[in-house]
Amino acid sequence: MAMAPVSQVPQPRRPHKWYQHLYVQVLIAMALSILLGYFAPDVAKSFGPLGDAFIKLVKMIIAPVIFLTVVTGIAGMRDMKTVGRVIGKAMIYFLCFSTLALVVGLVVVNIVQPGASMHADPAKLSSSLVQTYVQRAHDTSLIGFLLNIIPATPVSALASGDILQVLFFSVLFGIALASVGEAGTPLLKVLESLSASIFRLVAILMRAAPLGAFGAMAYTVGTFGIRSILNLAMLVGTFYITAILFVLIVLGSVARYNGFSILKLIRYIKEELLLVLGTSSSEPALPGLMAKMEAAGCEKTVVGLVIPTGYSFNLDGTNIYMTIAALFIAQALNIPLSWGDQALLLAVAMLSSKGAAGVTGAGFVTLAATLSVIPSIPVAGIGLIFGVDRFMSECRALTNLIGNAVAAIVVARWEGKLDKNQLTAALNGEFGPVEAGEDLAGHVTTS
């Protein structure tokens, strides 16, 4: 899957002062908004448009992000026959464990029910569309849902922002662009340049996150009371515990079956994990992760295909988050979801998560994309969790990164392209650290 060129990967910068970190700014904004919502609820509710505006900004970039990520990724795989077997096996792995992550999140949130006592009023989500969701739930049929995935025109899909239509066209266009070979190279380069610009736009929009968090949290506390914060804290805790258990138990079992320790792997890629923790994004860690997987005995071809592709197709942390967050919103709004509704949510999340990028805020973008095609849950409901979403992004990115490291080793072993002795030596720390960028430029720019 095409990822950001080396030049796009953020380079080390001089240390920021503590108050310049986005994480700190969001934390301060949340603290102030909670105080305002508690002591002056009427005033706090007036700041709701700040959160609404930020959500609209996020929704604005959903379609281009998915289109460019999917098209450049598929088109970048030039020799389809050579890479087909590796990609096929990788996709089987991605499908199985992405589905498992979604199911795990679904099961946990049904058991814990972190939003059940919030009792938020859907009518107070400041959206006149809320009243249409019940009717849409009755009007939507399976056949109609499937037919609606096919857009009338490519332009209409992008203009309307229908995520499944955008994804459908993106996959077809990516395959077509890859099939024309060198004739498609100029267009691919243009799309990669445009992708860099869109990712930069995402970064720019994320600078407004403190204002959006302030507005969303102030409105939430002012409207629903301080008890809502307890529910949000429970949401964050539920997600973190679920992600940790998924890594240790599910991925740990996979690692043990394939002859290595998940804890040793985590220690081996600790520098990349710290980079992810500092940026809330798995993208900056891509070159280092690829270098380390090669050094750990995975063949370069497998690494160059599996890891970049996994950045869009193997997002375990994002998938866990999506089902937990979506059902939290439904529980908070007292919207009962049947098992059929939850199965639809799982299916849509499986598709929409394939357009998620490894950048800060992408999980929230993907959640908005998912809810936009689920008739029972108001998209405006994401405003309930926006204030704490920033504090779940690190866990999403960390889980995604670990999942892709495991995937590279498993697929390499599956293909017979893994040096087991080298893997053991690497995980036991028997040679020095590997630096990012060692013969990786070609992979990062064209995979």
Curated annotation (Swiss-Prot):
Pfam families: SDF (PF00375)
Keyword Cell membrane: yes
Cellular component GO terms held in the UniProt record: plasma membrane
Subcellular location: Cell inner membrane
SUPFAM superfamilies, alphabetized: Proton glutamate symport protein (SSF118215)
GO molecular function: fumarate transmembrane transporter activity; malate:proton symporter activity; succinate transmembrane transporter activity
Any GO BP annotation: L-aspartate transmembrane transport
Keywords: Cell inner membrane, Cell membrane, Membrane, Symport, Transmembrane, Transmembrane helix, Transport
Entry keyword annotation includes Hydrolase: no
Functional description taken from the UniProt entry: Responsible for the transport of dicarboxylates such as succinate, fumarate, and malate from the periplasm across the membrane.
Database matches in NCBIfam families: PRK01663.1
Protein name: C4-dicarboxylate transport protein
